[in-house]
A protein has these predicted regions:
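Generic internal hydrophobic packing segments that stabilize the cores of diverse globular domains
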Residues: 69, 73, 128-134, 143, ...
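Short beta-strand-loop/turn "lid" adjacent to the catalytic site in phosphate-handling enzymes
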Residues: 59, 81-135, 163-170, 201-223, ...
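A generic structural motif
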Residues: 37-39, 137, 320
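Short edge beta-strand segments in beta-sheet-rich domains
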Residues: 32-34, 129-133, 300, 318
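A conserved helix-loop-beta module that forms one wall/lid of the active-site cleft
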Residues: 238-250
Length: 516
């Protein structure tokens, strides 16, 4: 029998909080290989829980940088052992957990450019980092630095207009400021600061990869309109910061070819391109194939909204990032803490712990709930900062309780109305071609999705997003190969599996979520 034809492909990587994952996607956009290395399970010597170390103060949260390097060694060796044909890889790209930062020690670039193919990366890069434990997105120890940054630029709203977000503890600029203030010696011995995404890209390049616009938008340092570092923000954080960061680049940039290390050790082709790595949320937007006017709603423990925006209006809530697949446009992220746990609580209290009873309540109550409205925040909400359960009757009077079925509809309509109101606050508008892509646990409940369609007045589709950051990275690698010819991302991914239609708005629904 003839050998199966070799499959040209792109690789998509995801350096996330708990694991490193890879997928291989062929020219027809089929995923035909995937693998992962789990930090807690496969790298016990680093002693992480959930991929991180939570320090004694409960606020500082870090990950060992060499753990990430060793994870890449392990996964590449696993691929080699499985017989994966690296010679067919046209390009690769990847995603990193957002906001985390890596500090390369003076002299590290020479080591990167002269790697020996006979040794794993982690053995050669041991002395290359001025900070061995990298701050990650779960860290909330930089409140003082956040206040300093906002004061330096004229307040929280001014910072948001400039960089897309007010100052957040996890954002990289504030983390860099803390390191400069508390460990000035380590800072002075740092020649380059990478995000987790550009750090991972640097490992493949054998030289420092630039930060891309989209992940760079999560630092409180990048001017999202001009796509350059804000001098005021850099100056407020630390000296000589611009030279340590390098210049940012468009997210679809080809930043180089893989280092000869990968050619000699694993058999990558010398021409294999590295497309700029980005953050995990922007990569997920690519994996879900959002287009202009679309929204993705992830209905999980917390609910997250991804929006495609043309003209953003940055606010004190939510985040605006440069769009990873269209340099002219933007994306927004809104996070809501009271997600599935709140839905489960009301299900337990009002529907005898049964999702089918919960669905019956949504089916038997009318759209708009007879004017009854509720907002349910059992834990302190992020968007907006508010706590408690708030119920309003049709006469707009606060009431202490609703009938069980009204309670259930009030919860779901209220959750989705809040999402629409906050999305519109960031400049989002529902368009005739708008699609809503629903993912996460609650996306399996068609009655919940019907309410979502009615509140936004747009059709809801469901999509499998098990590996959306990884698959999105492979799609972006294909786009990087084509982007030099100005081919739009939507054209590159048109062969990918289509999402499934789950709900269309009920006639008259446009009145429900429309701003009053």
């Amino acid at each position: 029998m003839a050998e199966p034809a070799a499959r040209s492909c792109c690789l998509g990587w995801d350096f996330s909080t708990q694991q490193v994952k890879v997928v291989a996607v062929d020219a027809e956009l089929n995923v035909f290989y995937e693998d992962s290395v789990h930090f807690d399970r496969d790298l016990l010597e680093f002693g992480t829980q959930g991929g991180v170390h939570v320090h004694e103060n409960g606020l500082t949260v870090t990950s060992p940088v060499l753990m990430w390097v060793k994870a890449l060694d392990i996964i590449l060796e696993k691929m080699k052992t499985s017989g994966f044909d690296f010679s067919q890889v046209l390009a690769l790209s990847g995603a990193g957990q957002q906001h985390g930062s890596v500090y390369w020690k003076t002299g590290a670039s020479q080591v990167l450019t002269s790697l020996s193919p006979n040794l794993p990366l982690h053995e050669q890069l041991q002395a290359c980092f001025s900070i061995s434990d990298c701050p990650v997105w779960m860290d909330s120890s930089t409140t003082a630095q956040c206040r300093q940054l906002e004061a330096a630029v004229g307040g929280a709203q001014a910072l948001s207009c400039l960089t897309g977000s007010r100052a957040y503890e996890r954002f990289t600029g504030n983390q860099i400021a803390k390191i400069y203030q508390q460990n000035p010696e380590a800072y002075s011995h740092t020649e380059r600061i990478s995000l987790v995404s550009s750090f991972a890209a640097s490992l493949f390049l054998g030289s420092y990869s630039p930060i891309d616009y989209s992940d760079g938008s999560g630092m409180n340092l990048l001017q999202i309109q001009g796509k350059v570092w804000s001098q005021a923000c850099l100056g407020a954080c630390a000296p000589h910061l611009e030279e340590k960061l390098g210049s940012p680049v468009p997210s679809c940039s080809v930043v180089g070819a893989v280092s000869s290390y990968y050619v000699q050790r694993y058999g990558f082709p010398p021409g294999c391109k590295v497309v700029a790595f980005t953050g995990d949320n922007p990569a997920s937007l690519a994996g879900m194939r959002l287009e202009e006017g679309d929204i993705a709603v992830s209905l999980g423990t917390s609910d997250t909204l991804f929006l495609w925006l043309q003209e953003p209006t940055p606010a004190l809530e939510g985040h605006i990032f440069c769009n990873p697949v269209d340099t002219q446009h933007y994306m927004a992220l809104l996070c809501f803490k009271n997600g599935s746990l709140m839905r489960e609580k009301i299900r337990d209290e009002s529907a005898s712990r049964s999702w089918s009873e919960f669905s019956k309540a949504l089916q038997s109550t009318e759209m708009g709930n007879g004017g009854n409205l509720g907002f349910y925040f059992d834990v302190m909400e992020i968007t907006p900062e508010i706590v408690g359960r708030h119920r309003f009757s049709a006469e707009n009077r606060e009431v202490s309780a609703f009938p069980w079925d009204v309670e259930i509809r009030a919860l779901i309509e209220g959750q989705f109305m809040a999402k629409r109101i906050h999305a519109e606050g960031l400049g989002y508008r529902v368009m005739p071609k708008t699609k809503i892509l629903a993912t996460g646990g609650a996306s399996h409940n068609r009655d919940i999705l019907q309410v979502l369609a009615d509140v936004f007045g747009a059709p809801v589709y469901v999509i499998d997003t098990a590996n959306s950051a990884c698959v999105g990275s492979a799609y972006r690698a294909f786009h990087g190969l084509a982007a030099e010819t100005d081919v739009p991302f939507s054209e590159v991914v048109k062969l990918a599996p289509n999402p499934r239609l789950a709900a269309t708005p009920t006639p008259g629904a446009s009145q429900l979520g429309a701003p009053s």
